[in-house]
């Protein structure tokens, strides 16, 4: 089972996917927190990707639960934010990878509030 989610960060022509197996419902808040913390790195996809992943994993020391990859998973349970550091925007894709037509700036997304358990 699980509560699977991914965050994608554009890297050149490709993407890096950050994966959470158990915390899908909390991923958007963690992304917003990472954008607030990493505001000085919004234009640097390497540093911002690391900051986001660090916020996702927290102090987790397990060998499972989180991952980094080059592909979208087929069993994701939440829409996928796709970050573009060049334009500092987030495009959204549904769980199948199709664009939803929603676009947000990093600034707008980072000030949203999210319900948490």
Name each model-derived stretch.
Residues 4-9:
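Short beta-strand scaffold segments in enzyme catalytic cores
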Residues 17-29:
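Short, solvent-exposed aromatic-acidic interface loops
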